[in-house]
């Protein structure tokens, strides 16, 4: 229940780039030095990060655009009648160089960015947006796609071919192919504008986060803080040649400070810094950008014939429409609100015992007093557990879980190039010993890395039609976990252990991918289905049999004691209603921005407070603003999609019941989950995939039963 940024498990930067896919002719430079050209001579053809310089991106992207344009021209000029192979498959296979470069570029913007890269992005993103438009608005190309689509009854396609054809046709229509004249030009203008706005939004967010530090110089200001946090703050200050202790807005610094600091004024100061990000009078202000993004998306949706952006988005989701989303959010609201009120009351009572009867618990008091109450009720807190969650051990535990469930093994390979010295690369092998995937891990905060945690991919899986070769994926998990200090290894909080399991769940979805076509493989699924593989893994975090496989005290080697595990399990539902309401409030805020059918010109903060008022328990802080830093919905793929976490929670709780029933390491259940969900990607409708792993045949708010 900390105020940290919501767990950001955007399954990849591609989502930001889906909307972007090109135009320019200036690049005949076949620069022999450019590592993007030709095959990569690295283990498994991994990205040669050690050879890529900033100046390589632009020429390679321009060249990629040129090549894809030529490939598309060849599809259009083909004298043969349009068919599945010469049109749909040919289009699916186009743009290989471009995809390759954009995957690296997009991922570096999130994980290891700098001013040069950001400046380049301002130039490149509009080009990509324009290229994407040139494809979907290409009338001759669409005519051929439509021709194949209209013969779909006679084609007798396989399930994958059928899905690919549906997706291709829909993708054109959803990106303006049926628009005419003025409307086409307007669509181009709006999408171009949107790509610039979302980019600026996230840059502002990163810069504002990095710009802030609270430097404390008096020892007494540190009252209540655990030693490990004080040490880290001293090292942060020292790294910048400052005296004292520096606290930042990065989660490993911010969250513990809000939880443990006895100094209320300092908690308030740090809270306000975090919760007013991008609202100040400086160049990182996102207030206008929020309005522009919401309004631009609304206009795009209306241009395409929808009432609002949510209707446009949800048409291609399990939820299908706004009504289903509101139905889910409101059901949960009714279920949780009374309990959350009760939780607040208990915390208020505890605070008043200490502070007197007129004390009001404010948002900057919540983590502090809720931690005290948890300690009092369950005799447990994050710091008690931390020594048992040393990062290397946790990694062994998480990899070991995948080995137990799926028989896969992980081998670190230092020959695989990485983009930062803290990143590690692993080869992953299937139970028959065959090479399965490459997995990169990147655990700690850096100035060039955005907040949150996410899984992403450098190369999707697909099967080469000509050779039959199964080209395996390269995926990465990126976190912002507690760093090691001079005299302590990286000791994680329980919350960080859960986050690791969550992102690792996404990575299994990527690594087990087994589809013919790359656009259907891995995490390329309906957005409200994508969180099922990640969230089901979080359930293992409080399973004793799993914790026993790895949780050891980093100094004594002592196993995490049973009674501590029991207290952890007992406490796992502590303040759960408040935490759920918080997620619901973000879902309501998201829907409020994207169910508008008239442009927004009002006050962003007031609108936000109105949108989520039913889910708010704590007193309102008028200066605070979530929207200006809500990257999920303004820069990532979660616009009109934040409810997906809650939607998938219904699914994952149901599917995990099978593990609970048959044993948490049961291989039969694991195999079924792998074969029906993890390896299938987006090759069928999620409801079809989900049926075999369902425990109760639950009913979802759309009324479609599993």
What is each model feature region?
Residues 33-51, 56, 393, 397-409, ...:
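C-terminal, non-catalytic "cap/extension" segments appended to globular domains
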Residues 7-33:
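Bacterial Sec-dependent N-terminal signal peptides
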Residues 164, 196, 203, 208-232, ...:
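Active-site-proximal, well-structured secondary-structure segments within enzyme catalytic domains
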Residues 41-56, 105-124, 148-189, 248-288, ...:
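Short His/Asp/Glu-rich catalytic/ion-coordination signatures at enzyme active sites or charged loops
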Residues 1-9, 696-706:
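Conserved small/polar residues in nucleotide/adenosyl-binding loops
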Residues 97-107, 166, 170, 272, ...:
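Short, hydrophobic/amphipathic alpha-helical patches that form generic packing surfaces
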Residues 484-499:
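Short pre-active-site segment immediately N-terminal to the catalytic Zn-binding motif
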Residues 33-226, 231, 246, 659:
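N-terminal helix-rich structural modules
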């Amino acid at each position: 229940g900390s105020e940290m940024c919501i767990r950001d498990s955007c399954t990849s930067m591609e989502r930001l780039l889906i909307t972007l896919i090109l135009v320019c002719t200036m690049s005949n430079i076949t620069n022999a030095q450019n590592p993007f050209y030709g095959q990569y001579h690295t283990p498994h053809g991994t990205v040669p990060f050690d050879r890529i310089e900033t100046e390589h991106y632009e020429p390679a992207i321009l060249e990629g655009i040129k090549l894809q344009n030529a490939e598309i021209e060849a599809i259009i000029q083909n004298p043969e009648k349009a068919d599945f192979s010469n049109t749909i498959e040919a289009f699916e296979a186009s743009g290989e160089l471009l995809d390759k470069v954009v995957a690296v570029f997009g991922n570096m913007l999130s994980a290891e960015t700098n001013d040069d890269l950001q400046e380049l992005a301002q130039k490149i993103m509009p080009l990509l947006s324009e290229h994407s438009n040139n494809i979907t608005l290409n009338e001759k190309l669409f005519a051929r796609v439509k021709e194949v689509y209209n013969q779909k009854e006679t084609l007798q396609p396989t399930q994958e071919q059928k899905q690919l054809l549906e997706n291709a046709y829909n993708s054109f229509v959803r990106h303006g192919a049926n628009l005419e004249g003025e409307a086409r030009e307007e669509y181009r203008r709006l999408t171009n504008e949107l790509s610039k706005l979302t980019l600026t939004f996230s840059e502002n967010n990163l810069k504002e986060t990095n710009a802030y530090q609270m430097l404390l110089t008096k020892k007494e200001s540190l009252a209540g803080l655990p030693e490990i946090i004080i040490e880290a703050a001293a090292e942060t200050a020292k790294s910048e040649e400052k005296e004292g202790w520096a606290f930042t807005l990065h989660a490993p610094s911010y969250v513990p400070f809000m939880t443990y600091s006895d100094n209320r004024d300092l908690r308030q100061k740090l809270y306000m810094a975090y919760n007013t990000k991008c609202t100040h009078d400086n160049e990182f202000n996102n207030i206008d950008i929020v309005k522009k993004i919401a309004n631009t998306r609304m206009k795009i949706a209306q241009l395409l014939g929808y009432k609002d952006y949510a209707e446009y988005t949800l048409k291609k989701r399990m939820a299908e429409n706004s009504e289903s989303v509101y139905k889910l959010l409101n059901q949960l609201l009714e279920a949780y609100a009374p309990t959350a009120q009760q939780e607040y009351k208990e915390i208020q009572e505890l605070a008043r015992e200490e502070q007197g009867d007129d004390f009001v618990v404010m948002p900057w008091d919540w983590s502090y007093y809720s931690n005290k109450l948890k300690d009092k009720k369950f005799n447990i807190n994050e710091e008690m557990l931390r020594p048992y969650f040393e990062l290397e051990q946790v990694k062994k535990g998480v990899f070991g879980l995948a080995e137990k469930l799926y028989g896969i093994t992980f081998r670190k390979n230092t020959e695989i190039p990485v983009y930062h010295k803290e990143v590690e690369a692993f080869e992953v092998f299937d139970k028959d010993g065959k090479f399965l995937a490459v997995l990169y891990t990147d655990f700690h905060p850096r100035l060039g890395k955005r907040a949150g945690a996410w899984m992403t991919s450098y190369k999707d899986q697909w099967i080469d039609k000509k050779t039959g070769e199964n080209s395996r994926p390269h995926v990465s998990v990126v976190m912002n976990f507690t760093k090691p200090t001079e005299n302590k290894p990286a000791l994680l909080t329980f919350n960080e252990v859960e986050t690791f399991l969550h992102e690792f769940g996404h990575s299994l979805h990527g690594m087990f991918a087994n589809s013919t076509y790359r656009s259907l493989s891995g995490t390329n699924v309906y957005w409200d289905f994508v969180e099922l593989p990640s969230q089901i893994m979080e359930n293992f975090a409080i399973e004793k049999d799993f914790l026993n496989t790895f949780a050891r005290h980093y100094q004594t080697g002592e196993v995490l004691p049973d009674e501590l595990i029991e207290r952890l399990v007992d406490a796992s539902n502590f303040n759960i209603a408040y935490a759920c309401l918080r997620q619901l409030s973000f879902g309501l805020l998201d829907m409020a921005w994207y169910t508008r059918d008239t442009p927004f010109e009002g006050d962003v903060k007031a609108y936000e407070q109105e949108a989520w008022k039913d889910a708010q328990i704590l007193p309102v802080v008028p200066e605070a603003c979530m929207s200006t830093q809500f990257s999920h919905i303004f820069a990532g793929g979660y616009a009109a999609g934040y409810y997906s976490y809650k939607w998938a929670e219904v699914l994952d709780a149901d599917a995990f019941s099978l593990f609970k029933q048959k044993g948490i390491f049961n291989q039969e259940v694991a195999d079924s989950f792998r074969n029906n969900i993890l390896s299938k990607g987006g090759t069928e409708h999620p409801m079809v995939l989900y049926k075999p792993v369902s425990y109760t045949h639950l009913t979802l708010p759309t009324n479609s039963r599993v």
